[in-house]
Amino acid sequence: MEESINPIISIGPVIFNLTMLAMTLLIVGVIFVFIYWASRNMTLKPKGKQNVLEYVYDFVIGFTEPNIGSRYMKDYSLFFLCLFLFMVIANNLGLMTKIQTIDGTNWWSSPTANLQYDLTLSFLVILLTHIESVRRRGFKKSIKSFMSPVFVIPMNILEEFTNFLSLALRIFGNIFAGEVMTSLLLLLSHQAIYWYPVAFGANLAWTAFSVFISCIQAYVFTLLTSVYLGNKINIEEE
């Protein structure tokens, strides 16, 4: 399997991955269009497209509210809805098609199949939990809960690091492996004409399985984000 590269552009010391940037903008656009379309002309008794939006919304609230608590859920409900939709689409984009030039430049892939992208998402989640902890409880109380008692400071630092790393590596491993297997099956179909039916059937089954795994990973990522955030903002006052 030939190595693929993503096109990049440099602005001073900052390097932008054009494929990841384009995929991210596409995902944001799809989410915006979906929510705008489904929320137009909403009625008290939901029907049609409104049912779809409310079903997804209720599903996300159902597994995140126990971690956040009803007290804060209304402030974060739209965030978790958009995060879940973002991860579902991001995980499955690379399964739809593959756009790659002869020289190996890749113009279409799942952004979450890129380790740097996943590490960035994970870092933003951990950063958000600390920002919200300070905003909800104040800087002093947040620091105190993190550094008291003193002997648990190394354990707390290790916990934050492992949370950050596991959140990124879990989703990267699953999505990257899915795209690699899809590429291998496509290559198999090009080897000989008699391999085509086998490769087609295997690729169809693998794609269906990968979509399922991708949705599960979106669920897990959103769930863990709610757990980490809930742990930071729901600490009982001393």
UniProtKB/Swiss-Prot annotation:
The keyword Cell cycle does not apply. The chain crosses the membrane at residues 15-35, 76-96, 111-131, 167-187, 208-230. Its main location: membrane. The keyword Membrane applies. One of its GO terms (cellular component) is proton-transporting ATP synthase complex. Pfam families: ATP-synt_A (PF00119). GO terms for molecular function: proton-transporting ATP synthase activity, rotational mechanism. One of its GO terms (biological process) is proton motive force-driven plasma membrane ATP synthesis. Keywords: ATP synthesis, Cell membrane, CF(0), Hydrogen ion transport, Ion transport, Membrane, Transmembrane, Transmembrane helix, Transport. InterPro entries: ATP_syn_F0_a_bact/chloroplast, ATP_synth_F0_asu, F0_ATP_A_sf. It is found in: Cell membrane. It is a multi-pass membrane protein. Disulfide bonds: none annotated. PANTHER family: ATP SYNTHASE SUBUNIT A, CHLOROPLASTIC. Key component of the proton channel; it plays a direct role in the translocation of protons across the membrane. F-type ATPases have 2 components, CF(1) - the catalytic core - and CF(0) - the membrane proton channel. CF(1) has five subunits: alpha(3), beta(3), gamma(1), delta(1), epsilon(1). CF(0) has three main subunits: a(1), b(2) and c(9-12). The alpha and beta chains form an alternating ring which encloses part of the gamma chain. CF(1) is attached to CF(0) by a central stalk formed by the gamma and epsilon chains, while a peripheral stalk is formed by the delta and b chains. Belongs to the ATPase A chain family. This is ATP synthase subunit a. It comes from Streptococcus pneumoniae (strain 70585). The lineage of its organism: Bacteria, Bacillati, Bacillota, Bacilli, Lactobacillales. The gene is atpB.
